[in-house]
Swiss-Prot record:
Similarity annotation: Belongs to the bacterial ribosomal protein bL36 family.
Keyword field contains Protein biosynthesis: no
Location within or outside the cell: Plastid, Chloroplast
Molecular function, one GO term: structural constituent of ribosome
GO cellular component, one term: chloroplast
Name of the molecule in the record: Large ribosomal subunit protein bL36c
Length: 37
């Protein structure tokens, strides 16, 4: 899980979602997991 000021899709399979007010990227590729912090 990467914590970044700006989250971006890194590939076609990445999904940008909002969970408990936090913007997150979920993806089958574990390296692409990110959340905004």
């Amino acid at each position: 899980m990467k914590v970044r000021p700006s989250v971006k899709k890194m590939c076609d399979k990445c999904r940008v979602i909002k969970r408990k007010g936090k913007i997150m990227v979920i993806c089958p590729n574990a390296k692409h997991k990110q959340r905004q912090g």
